[in-house]
Amino acid sequence: MPGIRFVSHYAGVVGGVERYMERTARLLRVAGIRVDCCYAERTPDADRFLASFDASESMADALKHPSDCDLTVLHKVRDAATVRAFRESGPTAVFIHDHEYYCPRLSYYYPVTRRNCSRAYCEFVCGCCAMLRRPSPENTFRNNFTAFAALWREVRACDRFIVLSQFMRGILIRQGIPEAKITVILPSISIPAETTPPGPASNPPHLLSIGQLIKGKGVDLLLDALRLMKTPFVLDVVGTGNDEANLKRQAEPLGASVVFHGFSPSPDDAFRGVRAVVLPWRWQEPFGLVGPEALAHGVPLVGFDVGAIRDYLINGETGLLVPPGDTEALARAIETLLADPTKAAAMGNRGRELVSERFTDSALLRGWKSLFETQSPSMKRSTP
């Protein structure tokens, strides 16, 4: 049986990376592909998460013996020596979920101005930019220059690179990765059998924001936009992060109109009866699983035109797209859907159709099998 080994820091759902690993592992196993998991740190739901894999072990234990898997896929590994060790153990691909491998600031936008970056990695320039972050144990000369450059060298030496969007493919080409080494594999999104239409299910209507509560996700921009609105609403915020306390203080003038629910490893229930999901991202979102997940539930989107959002937010069809950082335009777009539940429902239905056409199990499996046929001798033998 062909085998693949997923390697990531966490055993357990912390964000979209782990949710992607979990769902993809289940689909690949059903297709007859063995999937193992290696990790550095267990989370409270590690046992549930690891049940999606055939076998699991720590990274330290995995590197003590040869692997019988045909391909190793690194999802979140931030240590150069560890990347090298897995790379030297056999065919290795890197799944680029975000900007952390080529931006020592990790966010791929500039400090102070918070304008998005478009440059290729340069050890000196990017290291200096990273030093402008707030003081922390990680914000050191060694981490920003020497260690980061070593990590990027090891990552670039891997055999293949996997991304979720054409947007990220373009960024990797800009970073000097050969086009032939990059594979775009769209995620598979579950389509629920029934949805609650984003119409007058609640009064006032509910909006939803899901994701880590960090600056790059832009929830502060969403709160700024909400303060400009006159239409009643309730914003449900699902997620946690290091900006949570600041966001709660910022939301105080909005009173009961903003509710923080904390983290949810399976947020499907949060989509029920929601008028719109808002994607107020500041950073260039590499994909944003929450977008097509919302559409799968028949919920339209409102978001800033950054990153890979155009892969699923078709302006006027599956939601409303506004210029990056324009909180006044964001407020107007949200109010448009709050005022017109029929339009919101139509956009949600179109989004559900788009997801069912584009983000399918079969498309995901074709992508992974194509990758295996390139890198895995065992897969070549077992594929008709």
Predicted regions and their residues:
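Conserved acidic donor-binding segment of nucleotide-sugar-dependent glycosyltransferases
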Residues: 315-316, 320-327, 336-341
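A charged, aromatic-enriched C-terminal amphipathic alpha-helix characteristic of glycosyltransferases
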Residues: 16, 342-373
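Donor nucleotide-sugar binding/catalytic pocket of nucleotide-sugar-dependent glycosyltransferases
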Residues: 124-194
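Nucleotide-activated donor-binding/catalytic signature segment of Leloir-type glycosyltransferases, i.e.
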Residues: 246-264
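A conserved mid-protein helix/loop that constitutes part of the nucleotide-sugar donor-binding site
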Residues: 18-23, 205, 209-228, 242-245, ...
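Short hydrophobic beta-strand element within catalytic cores of glycosyltransferases
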Residues: 300-303
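Short alpha-helical donor nucleotide-sugar binding micro-motif in glycosyltransferases
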Residues: 263-264, 270-274
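Short acidic/histidine- and often glycine-rich active-site loop of Leloir-type glycosyltransferases
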Residues: 292, 305-316, 320-321
